[in-house]
């Protein structure tokens, strides 16, 4: 049971396992089906065990994690989850079709040669072929990270939910930097249209360039997204409860500072882009456990590759 687990630093260093995965092996969630703890994962059960409240009106201070050597072991996972939540709550999920974990810093994906026309075939004629081969150009994975400086004395009396907001903001900005790499990959050799001044008809023209795929997403800079939102054709558009806005033809309008003001990217999020990582978010856990918060690094090593070039089109604004 969760009350009997011995928490120690080594749980962060098991090969191929996250801290939560290691806890789940010791305290499987399957054992709690039908109980009041069924909604909690193994890490959350440890927070309950030590009565550490990370949100709500009775939220604890950061120092609650350091009440004992065992509770201190839980602190890096709290930091990691907050940063990861910020990282995941970004436009990355709006532009990524698939996520791949690579064991190497160089990644060679597969390439589909699908250029032969589709159509009817006579009985005596060979079927047109689609060929999948290994790519010839490797994607180099690069590290993107941040150094977090904080003293224990500065944050020990800070509420965990407030500190968590700060960490999530770091995760968001880290992810937005990663999105810059995604934009570069999407734009590379992409077909599209050109206009001297952005109008709704240009967006409709971009939409019409998609034949086999759907333009599920329109990615634009904040300034261009604002211009699109102000167009007369958008006056009846309504943002959903989650803040998402859609163009009349169904494409989600997504803004990102990683896109320049001369570019609008249309894509089918289900086919366009592969997000490749060699690791998840990497955090220096030992220092956090030992209250050495003055130089904590968080990073992700990643790259992007277009899976289906036809699922991406670009509108270029020349003025």
Language model segments and positions:
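Protruding loop/beta-arch "assembly-hinge" segments enriched in small, turn-prone residues
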Residues: 1-30, 287-319
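Alpha-helical scaffold segments that mediate packing/assembly in large oligomeric complexes
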Residues: 143-214, 317-319
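Extended oligomerization regions of viral-like shell subunits
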Residues: 197-290, 297-300
